[in-house]
Structures are given as C-alpha cells and as structure tokens.
Design a protein with these regions (language model features):
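Extended substrate/RNA-proximal surfaces in nucleic-acid metabolism proteins
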Residues: 57-208, 268-281
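Short acidic/His/Gly/Ser-rich catalytic and metal-binding motifs that mark active-site loops
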Residues: 155, 255-257
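Conserved, well-ordered active-site substructure
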Residues: 259-270
Length: 281
C-alpha cells in the first residue's frame, strides 16, 4: 500500500540509451533503495517501457512510462531536453524520434573514425559492442571502449573534454528536434511534457513559450540545480501553473556524478499529476 508521500525518481536511464544498467537490474536497484515509483526516461525511445512495467509489477514498484526527447531552442541554438510521461502512443513517439536516433548513431560512428585517425586503438566494431541493447552508439560507449583499453580512468575527465568538448577533435554537431515540436509530439502522443534540468542548458527563459504550447511541468530537483535554481523553478511553475518533478538522472557507470536513484530526495504526494494521470498499460 502506497503512503500519502511516495518516494520517487522521475529521471533514470537504462542501456536502451546511454545508461549502463538493464531494466530488470534498474528496477531491482530502485526497489532496494526504497523507491516506490520510478520513470525510466531513455533518450528518444520508449523501447524498454513494457519490460519496465512488467518488472515493476514483479517487484512492487510503480513504473511511470517516460522518455527524454533531445531537442534545441531554434532561437538560441541551445539544447533543451523535454521529458514525456505517460505517453499513450509509444509507437508514435518512437517513430518520430527514430530519424534523430539514427542521425546520432551515424554522428558518433564518424567520431569513432576521427578518434581512430588520431591514433587511438579503437574502431566502429569495438564501440558498437557497448551499445548492445538500444543499438545507438553514444559518446559514453566510445569512452567505455577507451577506458577498457586503459586510455582513461573514467568516462568523464580530460580525455572526454579533449575529444568531445568545444572544439574537440571528435566533436560533431548533433541533429535534434525543435523543442516546440518535441512538446507538441508528446502532447499528440497523449503524454505530459516536462522541461528537464532547465539550468543545465540555460533553458529556464524558454518556459513561457513552452507553457503556451502545453508544457505541463518543470524538473526542479536535479543534481545540476542549486537551491536558488530550485526556487526560481518553483516560482516559474507557480506563475505558469505547471507541476514539479525531480530525478537523479542516473546513468549507472555512465553517470557524470555517482548519484544513485532517489538521491535527489524526491517525495511526491499520491495525487501528483504523474500518478493521477497514470495509465496501467
């Protein structure tokens, strides 16, 4: 029986995108940490959601279906990530995001070629093995291959910056969906759109426009956000009548910060919109 306040994490990644852990392992881990509800929000895909829901039923943990759509602000050029929750038409969202996943995959394979040309002992086949389940190569998979070859002590650090930082030797600009289109896509697919970590990419000033289009919420609890950031997000939510979410942005071994699920201390009332809108698929 769920308490009035539910310990939840609405932002977790699996190995369907750029997380290192499989969905069964993630669900068991979240349960062991005392979480009662989670959302696995892989980048631009909902491929693992049905498995997650079944695992949740097995282990007594509430699964809120979700995805994190990678997008950009067409006026500023800055990245904007939009979380989509309780998406009814999962196939529709999957099909709309598929071209961008393929573009990401091709871009990162080109990065592998640039890295190999610079003298690093990796190739495309090596890296693809790390992208096992989802099939899309991410920068974390490239770095994992380099870590396993003893060329970097971890995923993030000087080598990551050298390769993928601004002006890095393997930096290739990604192709993203317009953020306004991302919000509309989530709505068209029957979901709720939430602006992810608005201070990580300086997208807080984009809230008024996205709210006009049907944005439902703001992720105010995230490891990149200070108490001052959180207060600003709360005020924006009050002004635009949006709800608040939070999550660890956990990626397992691929996490930029070693923060486990639930580490943001997120507890939500049982009548929170994500629970209230929940559809038992």
């Amino acid at each position: 029986m769920l308490r009035n306040n539910i310990k939840a994490d609405f932002h977790i990644h699996s190995n369907w995108s750029d997380g290192s852990m499989g969905i069964p392992q993630l669900v068991r881990y979240a349960k062991a940490l005392g979480l009662e509800a989670i959302s696995i929000t892989d980048h631009d895909t909902m491929a693992g959601q049905k498995e997650a829901i079944e695992e949740g039923k097995k282990h007594g943990i509430w699964i809120i279906p979700g995805a994190e759509v990678s997008a950009y602000n067409s006026e500023t050029g800055r990245k904007v990530h939009i979380l989509g929750f309780n998406v009814r038409d999962m196939d529709g969202l999957e099909q709309a995001c598929r071209p961008f996943l393929l573009a990401r995959h091709r871009k990162n394979l080109q990065s592998v070629d640039l890295i190999a040309a610079a003298g690093y002992p990796i190739n495309q086949n090596d890296v693809v093995e790390y992208a096992s389940l989802g099939g899309t190569v991410y920068r974390q998979h490239i770095m994992h291959a380099l870590v396993d070859r003893g060329l970097s002590p971890g995923i993030y650090g000087p080598l990551y910056t050298k390769l993928f930082g601004s002006g890095g030797l393997a930096e290739i600009k990604a192709q993203y969906m317009n953020a306004e289109e991302a919000v509309q896509l989530i709505l068209d697919c029957g979901g709720l759109a939430v602006l992810a970590h608005p201070f990580q990419y300086n997208s807080i000033d984009f809230i008024p426009r996205l709210a006009e289009l049907g944005l439902s919420g703001i992720e105010y609890q995230h490891h990149t956000q200070t108490p001052e950031h959180q207060e600003e997000a709360i005020q924006a939510a009050l002004h635009h009548r949006l709800f608040l979410t939070g999550g660890s942005d956990f990626h397992g071994f691929y996490s930029e910060k070693a923060l486990p699920p639930g580490s943001t201390g997120t507890e939500f009332a049982q009548n929170h919109p994500l629970f209230d809108d929940f559809i038992n698929f």
